[in-house]
């Protein structure tokens, strides 16, 4: 966190900046941040803010940054504060002041909301795939132990004899409910947040539908 204002006589303590910096954990969202910026640049080109040449230069710079991070050749610094600033700073280093033009019609709040939603969408799908694999394994175990009898417990005491396969399928049903919850969660995060700006929108004629379409 930095002090964005003119009423302060000096900058914030370095300890405060280190404590508030999110770059240490939000750097995992670099792919989402870059994808969002590429889509935003294409939208800015469509509405006439960026020329074709400018958009291509920005996109190529962002692709280069992603490749650097993918290959472990990108160094993150606490002074960058967050992934958005780190990417923007490197972009300006690569292509000059044009990199700052990418921020037109978009605030940090926009980027945070978008990156988190895109990251969650990806992780929800990953978790669903892993959960389905686990459910398949449970079914296999249940089918191969159809005749195995085990004690069923209630109140920590043995109560009735049950089939081990039924016991395993109980976990299958629990995970099936979890899949339903994940699908509902996906619907809730699959919403386009861009366009609000810092608070109540912007005077630029942003095409939110195009950006949403580009991002899937």
Language-model segments: residues:
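A helix-coil-helix interface module used to build multimeric assemblies
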Residues: 1-201, 205-214
């Amino acid at each position: 966190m930095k002090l964005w204002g003119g009423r302060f006589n000096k900058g914030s303590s370095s300890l405060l900046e280190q404590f508030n910096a999110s770059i240490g954990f939000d750097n995992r969202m670099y792919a989402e941040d870059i994808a969002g910026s590429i889509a935003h640049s294409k939208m800015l080109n469509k509405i006439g803010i960026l020329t074709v040449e400018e958009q291509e230069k920005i996109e190529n710079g962002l692709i280069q940054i992603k490749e650097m991070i993918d290959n472990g050749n990108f160094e993150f610094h606490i002074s960058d504060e967050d992934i958005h600033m780190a990417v923007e700073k490197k972009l300006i280093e690569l292509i000059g002041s044009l990199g700052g033009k990418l921020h037109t019609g978009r605030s940090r709040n926009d980027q945070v909301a978008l990156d988190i939603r895109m990251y969650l969408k990806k992780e929800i799908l990953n978790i669903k795939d892993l959960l389905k694999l686990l459910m398949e394994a449970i079914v296999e175990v249940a089918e191969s132990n159809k005749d195995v009898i085990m004690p069923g417990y209630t109140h920590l005491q043995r109560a009735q004899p049950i089939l081990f396969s039924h016991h395993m399928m109980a976990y299958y049903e629990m995970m099936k409910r979890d899949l339903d919850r994940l699908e509902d969660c996906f619907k809730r995060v699959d919403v386009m947040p861009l366009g609000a700006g810092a608070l109540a929108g912007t005077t630029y004629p942003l095409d939110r539908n195009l950006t949403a379409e580009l991002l899937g």
